[in-house]
Regions:
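Glycine/threonine-rich flexible loop motifs
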Residues: 85-102
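Interdomain hinge/lid region at the active-site interface
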Residues: 196, 221-225, 240-355, 403-445
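Small-residue-rich helix-loop
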Residues: 237, 241, 369-407
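C-terminal amphipathic alpha-helical interaction region
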Residues: 423, 428-501
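NAD(P)+-binding Rossmann beta1-loop-alpha1 motif at the extreme N-terminus of oxidoreductases
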Residues: 2-78, 82-84, 106-110, 147-151
């Protein structure tokens, strides 16, 4: 790398349209994306070697004047035209805070700092206050699409002050994925940490839907299908249209992938450790939703599925000690006709579980918006439209969701947009859950989705009536009455005999 100079010469000063801090899994591809769009990009990374290598490699394609590297934050700032615009692409948490601290030290008044990490929306709101109190400007902006999306065009979820967004908008829109109608997959989500809030719940939905597809795969395996046969089922579902999506596509690839290191031609999934990592956004989403009083059982179960996968030694030990629980294999269909029926039931189980998960996701977003004043709800149709390309959630089911919020922004629950599908598919979902329960196949998100759909469409919950009275017995907590189907405003206590625990 000796031929690469990171010296900031006068001809380089003020030439970069945008700066990228962090040339890693996301920062490198996004830099190349912006170079493709004709922007001059300044880069900084903790490793000078990484900067030198990146500049040396890509200046051959884009020219030395288009990609500019710097060794220090001070030199990095000199490369940028004013007002400076800097995107942070480093791990969330302390690394992000360290970068912001250094940028605040070196940038000038009115310069813009954009954090693209998976940060908690409350943290983004605090950062915005801190940065803007120092005379700089701040946006929190989530990114979806992974490294490939960053390279070819991701979906972006900015949130903060509108005037700040207007300054960075041309660059972000140019780099964003484009939907089939040509619109960039980015929209201003709302105030404060709104962008990070949307990305948080985007990730929670991703957790749930990935787990639903994984549970569908495991169920099909239990029906006796191998990887290629499972691919056949998934392809037939994709061709039906409603479930066509990026997450179906990647599940299809996983199902048929052979293990290159196996001599017997077996599938890679058979040799993959059954432990799912996570970065915390799913858990945050569930915690905040529950704090706001919103039930999100499918989203919660997706988090729990990951947590249970990570305690593998405990699971293996329990498996050895508790064979009576283990020995309940999912019964394979007895005939081709029965298999066809089981697979059709599973189709509806997947469809309705995804619908239930998205319903919970958007109920949570609206409740969090109301609680924290993020001004997201009015933007939901446009936000959902940003999921259409460059985004892990992209899929055909987004269309009826977008239409539902456009036609009725106050729709009580997104489930109301799926009335016909619920009527058609609930028997299949119930039958699938019964088979899974009797066959000992864990499918927490599908089962939780059935619970959500069943509970949230009941006018009276008998179990809730019992628990309300139980609380009055032991704690005199009081209960409301039902009169003509309506809940009374006053509370009551019944006369109970003394029962000392």
């Amino acid at each position: 790398m000796a031929d690469v100079s990171l010296e900031v010469t006068p001809e380089k000063e003020g030439k970069a349209d945008v700066g990228i801090v962090g040339i890693g899994v996301m920062g490198g591809p996004l830099t190349l994306n912006m170079l493709d769009k004709g922007f001059t990009v300044a880069i900084w990374d903790l490793s000078t070697e990484v900067i030198e290598k990146f500049v040396a490699t890509h200046s051959k394609t884009y020219g030395e004047a288009k990609i500019l590297g710097a060794k220090t934050y001070e030199d990095f700032a000199k490369l940028l035209c004013k007002p400076r615009k800097v995107l942070i692409l480093v791990p969330a948490g302390k690394p992000t805070d360290a970068v912001i601290e250094n940028l605040m030290r070196t940038l000038d008044e009115n310069d813009v700092i954009v954090d693209t990490g998976n940060s908690h929306f409350k943290d983004q709101s605090k950062r915005a206050e801190m940065v803007e109190a120092a005379g700089k400007r701040f946006l929190g902006m989530g990114i979806s699409g992974g490294a490939e999306g960053a390279r070819k065009g991701p979906a972006f979820f900015p949130g903060g002050t509108l005037s700040i967004w207007e300054d960075i908008k041309p660059i972000v829109e140019a780099a964003a994925a484009k939907a089939s109608d040509g619109r960039p997959c980015v929209t201003m989500c709302g105030r404060g940490g709104a962008g990070s809030c949307v990305k948080m719940y985007h990730n929670a939905g991703e957790y749930a839907v990935l787990q639903i597809w994984a549970e569908a795969f495991a169920t099909l395996r239990g029906f006796g299908l191998d990887g290629e046969q499972i691919q056949g089922v998934l392809n037939s579902w994709r061709e039906r249209g409603a479930l066509a999506s990026y997450m179906l596509d990647i599940t299809y690839e996983v199902a048929g992938q052979r293990d290159a290191d196996a001599t017997d031609g077996s599938f890679l999934v058979e040799h993959t450790a059954d432990m799912i990592g996570s970065k915390g956004t799913g858990l945050w989403s569930v915690q905040v939703a529950l704090d706001c009083g919103v039930p999100v059982p499918s989203l919660a179960q997706a988090v729990l599925a990951r947590q249970m996968s990570m305690v593998r030694p405990e699971r293996v030990d329990n498996c050895r000690r508790l064979q009576s629980v283990v020995e309940a294999p999912l019964a394979a269909p007895a005939s081709d006709e029965e298999r066809e029926r089981f697979v059709e039931d599973l189709y509806w189980a997947v469809y309705l579980s995804i619908a239930a998960s998205y319903a919970q996701m958007f109920q949570a977003v609206r409740a969090v918006d109301k609680e924290f004043g993020l001004e997201i709800t009015g933007n939901l149709p446009r936000i959902i439209s940003t999921f259409r390309a460059g985004c892990i959630l992209q899929g055909a089911m987004l269309e009826p969701m977008t239409k539902a919020f456009e036609d009725n922004p106050g729709i009580p629950n997104l489930l109301c947009a799926f009335e016909k599908e619920l009527a058609t598919g609930m028997p299949g979902l119930r039958a699938t859950c019964a088979r899974l329960a009797m066959g000992g196949e864990p499918a927490g998100v599908i089962q939780a989705s059935l619970t959500y759909l069943t509970t949230m469409t009941r006018s009276v919950l008998n179990s809730a009536q019992v628990v309300s009275l139980q609380r009055d017995v032991f704690g005199r907590h009081g209960f409301k009455r039902l009169k003509d189907g309506e809940v009374t405003s006053e509370s009551y206590n019944a006369d109970w005999k003394e029962m000392i625990p």
